[in-house]
A protein has these predicted regions:
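Nudix hydrolase/Nudix homology domain
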Residues: 2-28, 98, 109, 134, ...
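Conserved Nudix-box catalytic region and its N-terminal flanking loop in Nudix hydrolases
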Residues: 13, 20, 25, 60-65, ...
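Acidic, metal-coordinating catalytic segment for phosphate/diphosphate chemistry
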Residues: 32-72, 76
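Acidic pyrophosphate-coordinating catalytic loop
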Residues: 35-40, 93, 138-148, 206
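Short beta-strand micro-motifs in enzyme catalytic cores
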Residues: 43-47, 98, 148-150, 171
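Short loop segments at secondary-structure junctions
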Residues: 52-54, 75-79, 91, 154-159, ...
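Unchanged
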Residues: 58, 69-70, 106-192
Length: 211
């Protein structure tokens, strides 16, 4: 097997030709950890840690979160070529604007992620799905937020009554995939989880057609 070819550039930069070997490495050594703040959704900690390659400990302010599930709900009953994607419109105070998003929600303490995804889809949209597939998972903003986002593909949809929480004001749409992609290209969809899930799904569809 041919070895990975690497060429060192300026300031230790490595230019990889071929496959990049993914090396997660070891976690930093936590010297101290103090909880600074807590609300129902998350907890804030100030940690003093010794990171690999560093001579002195550093301070890291981080948010601990149970993690979230993201649901890409797809209805291809009317069109296999251009299926409908469930999209929500809701106001996000942190962003100070209305955003168009796929359904998502927090995982409760001790809750299985698939069970959480099924619960959130029903609560927010009323839809139930016959087929569930794990697409990917990623960190939302790992510089300070320890939140995993688990993305599920939900297919074989059946409509029902939504059961949103009291503070959730949602408008629910079913939008053709081609239109969602057009809005992404135009910069009109600005929600990260929606960008990740829709663009990954579109890529997998293209790959499946080629295969």
């Amino acid at each position: 097997m041919a070895k990975k070819k690497e060429k060192k550039g300026a300031q230790g930069l490595k230019v990889v030709k071929g496959k990049l070997k993914i090396e997660p490495g070891k976690p930093a050594k936590v010297i101290s950890s103090t909880q600074a703040f807590e609300v129902p959704l998350f907890r804030v900690f100030t940690d003093e840690v010794q990171e690999a390659g560093e001579e002195k400990p550093v301070r890291r302010d981080i948010i601990r979160h149970n993690g979230s599930v993201v649901i890409l709900a797809v209805d291809d009953s009317k069109s296999k070529k251009d299926p409908l994607i469930v999209i929500e419109r809701q106001y996000r105070h942190a962003a100070e604007q209305f955003l168009y998003e796929v359904p998502a929600g927090k995982v409760d303490d001790g809750e299985d992620r698939l069970a959480a995804a099924k619960r959130e889809l029903i609560e927010e949209t009323g839809f139930r799905a016959k087929k569930w597939t794990r697409l990917t998972r990623y960190f939302a903003s790992p510089g300070f937020l320890g939140e995993w986002m688990q993305v599920f593909l939900a297919e074989g949809l059946t409509a029902g009554d939504a059961e949103p929480e009291a503070d959730e004001k949602l408008e629910i749409y079913q939008v053709p995939l081609s239109e969602v992609l057009r809005l992404i290209d135009a910069g009109k969809i600005r929600d990260g989880k929606t960008l990740v899930s829709v663009m990954l799904y579109a890529r997998l569809r293209k790959k499946k057609k080629r295969d």
